[in-house]
UniProtKB/Swiss-Prot annotation:
ATP-binding keyword on record: no
Cellular compartments per GO CC: extracellular region
Transmembrane segments: none
GO terms of molecular function: toxin activity
Oligomeric form and interacting partners: Toxicity requires sequential binding and synergistic association of a class S and a class F component which form heterooligomeric complexes. HlgC (class S) associates with HlgB (class F) thus forming an CB toxin.
Keywords: Cytolysis, Hemolysis, Signal, Toxin, Virulence
Keyword Magnesium: no
Signal sequence, renumbered to the chain: 1-29
Annotated source species: Staphylococcus aureus (strain Mu50 / ATCC 700699)
Top-level taxonomy: Bacteria, Bacillati, Bacillota, Bacilli, Bacillales
Top-rank taxon, per record: Bacteria
Family: Belongs to the aerolysin family.
Name this protein carries in UniProt: Gamma-hemolysin component C
Protein's GO biological process: cytolysis in another organism
Amino acid sequence: MLKNKILATTLSVSLLAPLANPLLENAKAANDTEDIGKGSDIEIIKRTEDKTSNKWGVTQNIQFDFVKDKKYNKDALILKMQGFISSRTTYYNYKKTNHVKAMRWPFQYNIGLKTNDKYVSLINYLPKNKIESTNVSQTLGYNIGGNFQSAPSLGGNGSFNYSKSISYTQQNYVSEVEQQNSKSVLWGVKANSFATESGQKSAFDSDLFVGYKPHSKDPRDYFVPDSELPPLVQSGFNPSFIATVSHEKGSSDTSEFEITYGRNMDVTHAIKRSTHYGNSYLDGHRVHNAFVNRNYTVKYEVNWKTHEIKVKGQN
């Protein structure tokens, strides 16, 4: 279990002078206070919370940036969702058989944010559209008066008073928004296509990851070696997603948010078969979404007045 930590940073941004270098977040920032300009038109108050579940193989690192803007008639909160989701890829004998081996692997990683507070609304999030590139980099910017805008890359933040960026790698996977409304957003990072020794294969190919050693007794040997597996299958996924919410001022002191990290697992079977001449080979069989929503959900309470974050529950 990672030790919970709180990072508190207060920034003052003046309307009188433009920002030449807007402040970017730093997940490893130490406790400090930094003033930019004079006038205190904007106050950014930062908190960070870490939660780990060995049961689910997940670590949540959540940054809560409270935006206190005198020119905006609502409270605003930027939530940056980082951490690690282990792949939990495993190899085993299927139902204690000697000729069928199984590989359980993550077809999809799940990242979601949800609130049931009637005074809270989702107003922006990143990423928005389906993204197929290996490296994903986007920026969410804020300008005085409640104006949130997104930029396509880390370099596109020069005109913002304050900005928050995401950056992650998704080799052989694609990101897309699966569900979104005024109270929630759910992303899926899904297997796409893979380069193999026998050519490009779809993520739905029944022989995907099936190896070439039908005479081994070790289930691992029935599948391709680690060197042929992408990081999101071999190791896991480091998410970096952003959601921005607004809150009606004076309506309630606290709101609750549920943040979910997890995975949907496929199972590939490698079945030892023999030809008419007695030669052995491996035949693949696929079970899509054999285990779905293997998720770790943490409920966070946000205090809009004191800017405290409390963990209210987890599964």
